[in-house]
């Protein structure tokens, strides 16, 4: 393999914390303990749904926690409720939106912000990048807003959504194992080593490949602000403050959605020229993220299958 060529801001030397090979550093006990700590954190009852750009004039249906919900644009913003019409059970997402109200496709019943029987709109939050829904019956203490990690003030964002045959915890476990990065994704990571690890987070020095063996090296911190999210934040090198948020939302007992948002920023003056090009740059970021997640979904699904098989023995 040809030599890695690094450009960008030079990072301060960090002492080698371990000379063990990656397979020994990737301690299953530490990963399991870190995952358990993350899953024990409060979630506020909030679940990420999708990229806010996906919600337009037509109603959209999403299955979350084994229930179908419909999202539509009301007069005062995005609304969400059960996709089942309270009249005779039609799928409301197959209907239309008129003057901020859902119109049932079977009988023309109009539903809006007011409850009807057991049917009622649920709390929705648009954070500027993602849409969240709050399920007050999921067993968590509700919070007014989602529990989120800090984001940069100015950024170029891109989001991908994929579905996987696994549990949210399998998605988090994948990200709590950064040691696999350069081995499983050699097309994206030129090299990677863990430089700091605690009970709550892990910091890696990683070289992202840009073109061939040309890469930019940064220090990145991984931590879980709530039980269905893990965030990577650039803490050293170019792009300090940039984040990659990976959210795992249960679809049902055997499937979950992976929603990953990249919020890229830079203090370099060239950033002001990059932001107006977002519509052309965004698909490139999404394509690279999707490629990674095709592989990482396979990792998570394999982990889930082995876990289920062990539990059945």
Walk through the language-model features, giving the residues of each.
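A generic structural signal for short, non-catalytic loop/turn and secondary-structure boundary residues
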Residues: 40-42, 64, 117, 126, ...
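C-terminal catalytic domain of Rieske-type non-heme iron oxygenases
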Residues: 145-313
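Short flanking/linker segments adjacent to small metal-binding domains or redox-active Cys/His motifs
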Residues: 17-28, 117-170
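Rieske [2Fe-2S] iron-sulfur-binding domain
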Residues: 48-148
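Short small/polar-residue motifs
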Residues: 45-49, 67-69, 90-91, 118-123, ...
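Short Pro/Gly-enriched beta-strand edge/turn motifs at strand-loop
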Residues: 42-51, 106-107, 175-177, 226-231
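Sequence-level motif detector for i,i+2 pairs with an aromatic at +2
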Residues: 43-46, 57, 75, 128, ...
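Zn-dependent metallo-beta-lactamase
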Residues: 2-65
């Amino acid at each position: 393999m040809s030599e890695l060529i690094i450009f960008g801001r030079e990072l301060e030397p960090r002492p080698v914390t371990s000379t063990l090979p990656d397979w020994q550093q990737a301690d299953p006990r530490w990963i399991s303990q870190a995952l358990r700590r993350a899953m024990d954190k409060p979630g506020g009852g909030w679940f990420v749904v999708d990229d806010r750009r996906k919600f337009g004039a037509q109603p959209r249906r999403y299955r979350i926690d084994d229930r179908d919900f419909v999202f539509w644009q009301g007069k005062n913003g995005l609304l969400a409720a059960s996709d089942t019409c309270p009249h005779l059970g039609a799928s409301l997402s197959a209907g239309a939106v008129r003057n901020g109200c859902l119109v049932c496709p079977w009988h023309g019943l109009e539903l809006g912000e007011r409850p009807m029987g057991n049917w009622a709109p649920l709390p929705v939050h648009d954070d500027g990048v993602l849409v969240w829904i709050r399920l007050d019956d999921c067993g968590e203490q509700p919070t007014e807003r989602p529990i989120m990690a800090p984001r940069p003030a100015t950024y170029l964002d891109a989001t991908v959504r994929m579905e996987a045959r696994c549990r949210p915890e399998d998605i988090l476990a994948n990200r709590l194992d950064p040691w696999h990065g350069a081995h499983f994704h050699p097309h994206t990571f030129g090299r990677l080593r863990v430089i700091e690890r605690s009970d709550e987070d892990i910091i890696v020095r990683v070289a992202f490949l840009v073109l061939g063996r040309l890469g930019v090296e940064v220090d990145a911190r991984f931590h879980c602000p709530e039980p269905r999210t893990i965030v990577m934040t650039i803490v050293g090198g170019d792009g300090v403050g940039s984040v990659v948020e990976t959210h795992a939302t249960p679809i049902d007992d055997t499937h979950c959605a992976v929603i990953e948002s990249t919020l890229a920023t830079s203090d370099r003056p060239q950033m002001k020229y990059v932001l107006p090009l977002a519509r052309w740059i965004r698909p490139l970021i999404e394509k690279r993220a999707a490629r990674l997640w095709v592989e990482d979904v396979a990792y998570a699904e394999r982990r889930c299958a082995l876990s289920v098989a062990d539990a059945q023995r």
